[in-house]
Every structure is written in structure tokens, then in C-alpha cells.
């Protein structure tokens, strides 16, 4: 029991003194009474004091006013004492709106008690109002002032006072009557004295009563024996119950260990399930990303295939042109020889020089085209290298994500294990507390049983003493009765005076007998009460034992239910393990397939790079051949041209139109994109090569609009444009057609000498205005993304444009929707 008493001492020192009946507010300058109770945990001292502190105090010196606590009278250690103090009104604080509280401070300066907060407030008119129910049972509330209510109470008290005065008068009359009754009773007492003769009959009755008391004493002895036997049986039951409780505790400990193991396994399985679900989601995301990357790579491979095919076509076309030019050069040499033999006029030589110059320019243009093709091949190789680098970075990022996944899974497992440990610790603490509570109850029951056993022994001793006293009193009583009979026999032969004296002496033994009877009756009644109390306590102990047995049975049932639930959860966890193992195997198979696809793509990239290197070497050889052929003397070319012109009858006009490149000029400066999405701009696809400025044909551009991002998602070239490119003539055109088709790369006929006009703002520029500045002006009207440099038309929706820009800053990098 001492452990239960020490808990509040250690927990709170402010509860050692309890303040009673503390109101929420007091009047500022009115008399204030403070009632408090000293608990057994504090020892009062004459230097202890009670102070009024403002709420928020930090030390015992922050008091507003105080009074010395008086020492309680008749104080007994270990008992609670009620005390009272009275604070005078002029020492109290004014109505300042602050909260105060009473605090009990010891002579050592320790604060051992604090009251609830209160205020000092002057009475407001609203506070003077009170609500009370109507006395006429009309379910109405009547609002009155305190003064009116007090007046009503005073009137009632005055009426009660008058009634009490009337009652006093009546009671005085009754006292006179009672005095008369006392006199009458005294007379009756005298009459009762005359009834002394009846006492002898009562003595005979008392003898019978004493015999009955003996019988009752024997019955009490029997009851005592029964109680002792029951107490012994109870002790045996307590011993058996303690053994059973110990067995149950051992069973509880074993079941708790099983339960802890089951819970740990359950939590581990839950953590595994959660981690595997997370892995499943991550695998899904990874598969989605890999599929998107594969589609991108396939599209890029397709575009590169198309580029390679187009470049092969261009190479074959240029080879055919080279062979045709070689054949034409041979024919021209023959013609020149024949022409030199036939004609030698100055005009013909001038025409031949012009033709020779044009042929040289055409050869130079073909060289530039070959250089452009080489540059295109180098660009394709760079794109291939870039895609390979992107693949490598993707692999590295994949490995990094896998490492992060493993780290996150390890952290999740650690957190789950810590949570399980905390739960098991709390459960173990609660179970230990319950076991200690049961042990305390059993100890208390054993102590209670020992006390009862001691009380039974004490009662047995009292019964033995009473039996001895009753035997002695019976012997004395029989002796007195014998002496009384002798006196009665002697009084028969004496005078009436002697008989009167004997009559006076007879009541003495009757008073002793009545005292003895009263004592025996009182002792018997006390013993019966004690026996009844003992039986009640015995029944209570028995009930407690039954309650403990029922609790043990309940715990056993609960543990059985927990075992069943644990087995079910183990089965569910095993099934989940099997399902997760299947899912993991499927994902591993899918990952292996994806890795095979990636390895196949990488090998395909390597093959493409080898083929491109081979094509580059072939193109270099072709360029060398062209350079060797173009190094012939211009004299031979002029002769060839003369002979051909004489045979045909007219001067051949060299075609001024350049063959349109299908994949753009690599030396141009377009706004490049990333290239990872596989889309190219139209100006990268179809843009004519830079023409030689010495041809003498000026371009009067009226309107020019820069290329925009109008690429097709499924292919890199427009079928209509490709058809038009196929229709471009390679044969020499007449001079008129040459002059008209000279500016086909722009939107208007250059024969018109018109000013340049912006197609968006309709601003006019002079004909000799710089073309690059004009294009910069036109491009300034378009919206350009600051991240990917993608261009949008001026009338493009601003919200859609901002949403496009915000996608570059989206935190969810894996979101490709």
C-alpha cells in the first residue's frame, strides 16, 4: 500500500494543500474568507503563510498580500485538517482585470498548493440581476435584482421568526404539561415499587434465559468451528488460486511472446507488401518510360534510315551526273578539236570563254554540293553520337533510380521495424502493469485473509472468556438464590417489621441479575454483529476470487482468438508472398526483354555508324575524283564547247538552277532544337544551297517569311514537297526559263523591282535592305519558348503558350503525358 501512497507525492507538490469554495470573482474592498485543507502529505509550521499571487508568478516573492497560516488545534500527523483565513478588504487589490490565485507557501519558501484563478471585480448592474422560476408552476423565468430577492428572503425569515415564537409559546405549554406528567410518572414509580413481588417471578424467567444463553453459546461455538473450517478452506483456495495465477502468468508470457512474434512477422509482411507495391508502381513507371524511350529511339532510327536512303540516292544521282559530265567533256573535247579546225573568229572565242566560265562555275557548284553532303553526313553522325550519349545517360539515371529505390526501401524497413518495436514495448509495458496489478490484488487478498484469521482467533478467545464468565456468574447466582431462600424461611417466624426489612432487601439480587443479563445480551449482540461482518467479508473475498477466475478465463479466450487471427494473418501473408513473387518474376522477365531490346538497338546503332563511316569514305573518294576531273585546262573545255555549239547550231545555256537539297544546308544558321524528339524544321529539310554570286543574276525579294516549327510528327518530309523536288529539271533550260526560275526559293517573282513588305505588320522596307535584318524583324512578331526555342504564331493562345513553358519546370520529370 505504501507504493500507492508515494505516487502523488512524487507527481505534484501543488496538490498538498487544497483550496475549497474558491469563487470566480470577489469584490475589491470587501472582507474575503479563504478555506483550505491540509492533506496528510504536508506538515504544518507556524511560519507557513497563504498569499494572493497574480497568475503567471515565478517565485514565492511575487505575492500581492499574505497572512500567516495558523497552526491547527489538536493536530494529528497523517490526517487532513480544514483551516480558514480572513483577508481584510483594504489589503486586497482593486478591479484591475487581472487574475489572482491563493498559494500556500511553507517556511522554506516552497509552494505546496495553488487555487483556481479568480478576479476582483466590482458588481455590475447586470450581475445584480438574477433569474428564478415562477412559483405558480407556469414554466416561466422571472428576472429580479439581488436586493429584491434579499428583501423577499428577509420577509420570509420574519414570518418564520413569528411562527417560531408561536411554536416556543406552544412548547412552553407543552413543558408545563410534561412536568405534570413527570409528577404523575413519579407516582407511578411508587406504584411500581409496590410491584416488587413480581420480580421473583422474573428471577425464575431469568434462570430460564440463562439456560437459553448457554444453548446459544454452544451454537456460537459450533458456528465458530464452521467459520474456522471455512477459513482454512478459503486459505487452501487462495493457495490454489495463486498457483493457478502463476500458471496463467506463465501461459500469458508464452502467449505474449507468440503474439509479439506474430505481430513482428505481420508487420514485416506488411512492410514487404508495401515495398513490393511501391516497387510494382516504380516498375510500371520505369516500363512506361522505357517504352517511351524505345518509341523515340525507333522514330530516330527510322528518320536516320530515311536520311541514309536519301543520301544514298543523292550519291547515286551525283555519280550519274559525274559520269554524264565526263562523257559530255569527252564529246566537248572532240567538238572543240573539230571547231578549232573549222573556225577561228574572235566572236566565237568570246562565246567560248563565257561558256568556259559558266562550266567552271557549275563545277564549283557541284563541289559545294559535295561538301554540303559531307557536312550532312557529319551532322547525321553527330546526331547518332548524341543519341548514344542520351542512351548512356538514361542507363546511368536508371541505375541511380534503382539505388535510390533500394535506399528508400531500406529506410522504410527501418522505420517499420522501429514502429513495431515501439508497439511491442507499449504492449509489454501494459501487460506487465496488468500482471503487477493482479499480484497486488492477490497480495491484498492474502493480507485480508490473514487479518480475518487473526480476528477469528480473537473472537474464539472472547467466546472462551465469556463462557468462563457465564459459568462463574451462574454459580454465584445459584448461591445467591440459595441464601435468599434461607432468608425467606427465617422471615416466616419473625415480626412484620422484619418482614418489611426483608422486602426491602429482596430487590438487591434482582438488580445484579438484570445487569448481568444486560451484559450478556450486549456481548451476544456484539458477537453476532462481528460474525455477520466476518461472513460478509468472507463472501466478498469469495466473490473477488470468482471475479479473478472469470478474468483469467476471459484472458485465455482472448488469447485463443488472437492465436486464430494470427494464424489467419499468417496464411494471408503467405498467399500475398506467393502473389508478390509471381509479380516480381513477371517484372523481371519484362525487364530482361526490355534490356534485350535496348541491347539490340545499341547494336543496330553501331551497325548504322559503321555504314555511315563507309559511306563517308565513298563520298571522299568521289570528291577526290571530281577534283581530279575539274583540274583539266580551261582550254580543252572551251574547245569542247565550241565544237558542241557548231554541231547543235546554237549556244548551249548552262542551267542556272541548282538542284534543291532535300535535307537542307548544314552551313545555314537555323534555330536548332534538341533533336531528341526526332522532329526537324522545314528549313532544315528543304533549303537550297548557297548560290554563286558571280552568276550576275540579282534577287529582288519582295516578301520573305522565316521558317517555323511546322514539322510533321510521323515523318520528316512533306510528300508534296518531295514530289516537287523530284520534278526539278536537271537538263539545261533556255535563257528565258533560267531567268524566270532563278528565284524559285522565295515567294514572289524577282523580275518585279518592288520594296520588301513584312507579311504581319505590313511595314515596307527598301529593296536593298539587308535580308538578315528583314528576317529578324519578321521573327520578332513570333513567340519563342525560352527553354526549347520553339516558335509559335503571334495569334497563338497566351495561356497555352505559358502552359508549354511551365512544362519544362514541372517537378514530375517522369510524367510524359
Swiss-Prot record:
One of its GO terms (biological process) is negative regulation of cytoplasmic pattern recognition receptor signaling pathway. It comes from the Eukaryota. Phosphorylated in the C-terminal region by CHUK/IKKA leading to NF-kappa-B signaling down-regulation. InterPro entries: CALCOCO1-like (IPR012852), CALCOCO1/2_Zn_UBZ1 (IPR041641), SKICH (IPR041611), UBA_autophagy_assoc_protein (IPR051002). A zinc finger (UBZ1-type) spans 755-781, 782-808. CDD domains: Zn-C2H2_TAX1BP1_rpt1, Zn-C2H2_TAX1BP1_rpt2. Residues 609-685, 704-742 are annotated as: Disordered. Residues 609-627 have a biased composition (Basic and acidic residues). Residues 144-628 form a coiled coil. The keyword Zinc-finger applies. PROSITE patterns: ZF_UBZ1. Ubiquitin-binding adapter that participates in inflammatory, antiviral and innate immune processes as well as selective autophagy regulation. Plays a key role in the negative regulation of NF-kappa-B and IRF3 signalings by acting as an adapter for the ubiquitin-editing enzyme A20/TNFAIP3 to bind and inactivate its substrates. Disrupts the interactions between the E3 ubiquitin ligase TRAF3 and TBK1/IKBKE to attenuate 'Lys63'-linked polyubiquitination of TBK1 and thereby IFN-beta production. The C-terminal UBZ-type zinc fingers function as ubiquitin-binding domains. Homooligomer. Interacts with TNFAIP3. Interacts with STARD13. Interacts with MYO6. Interacts with TOM1; the interaction is indirect and is mediated by MYO6, which acts as a bridge between TOM1 and TAX1BP1. Interacts with MAVS; this interaction induces MAVS polyubiquitination. Interacts with TNIP1. Interacts with TRAF6; this interaction mediates deubiquitination of TRAF6 and inhibition of NF-kappa-B activation. Interacts with RIPK1; this interaction negatively regulates RIPK1 ubiquitination. Interacts with NBR1. Interacts with TBK1. Interacts with RB1CC1. Interacts with SQSTM1. This is Tax1-binding protein 1 homolog. It comes from Bos taurus (Bovine). The gene is TAX1BP1.
